[in-house]
Amino acid sequence: MHITARVDYAVRTLLEIARAPQADKAVIGATAVQVAPVVKAEAISTAQHIPPKVLETVLAELRRADLVTSRRGPDGGYWLARPAARISIADVIRAIEGPLASVRGERPEDVRYPGAAEPLQRVWIALRVNIRAVLENVSIDDIAQNRLPGFVETLTADPGAWARR
């Protein structure tokens, strides 16, 4: 699997926003609510070493996917559109690059092979199932809190996981 620079930047952007200090509570009516931290693009760019123009594009894609919200002006910036625990790495990849797995630009279930290659479609489907198993079950919050799911820790504890092949 190839993780593009834009996906890497998008995940790091969301992590930077998720880790921002929480703002004070605001009182709306009779209820105190936590105000989401607002993070400026410049702060994200500096903290994560993301080129500003690239970050601008990434933030626009995250906004279109309803993963972040923004406000202009001197008090403006970006904040998560929903709790970090409800944003999976799969959500981020889909927002930036589209489907998690594709074959020649098509979804695996839409690819057909003749003759001896016919079983290959099932291999691509199985690959997608396994990619989903990890990416849909790891959230921005899991990473921000350095609290990866147990199955991820188990997979990465195997020395073979780190071997280049």
Predicted feature residues:
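N-terminal helix-turn-helix DNA-binding core of bacterial DNA-binding proteins
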Residues: 5-51, 78
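Alpha-helical residues within the helix-turn-helix
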Residues: 46, 63-64
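Residue cluster at the C-terminal edge of the helix-turn-helix DNA-binding motif
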Residues: 64-67, 95
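Beta-hairpin "wing" of winged helix-turn-helix
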Residues: 66-80
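Conserved segment of winged-helix/HTH DNA-binding domains
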Residues: 84-109, 121-130
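C-terminal regulatory/oligomerization modules of transcriptional regulators
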Residues: 109-165
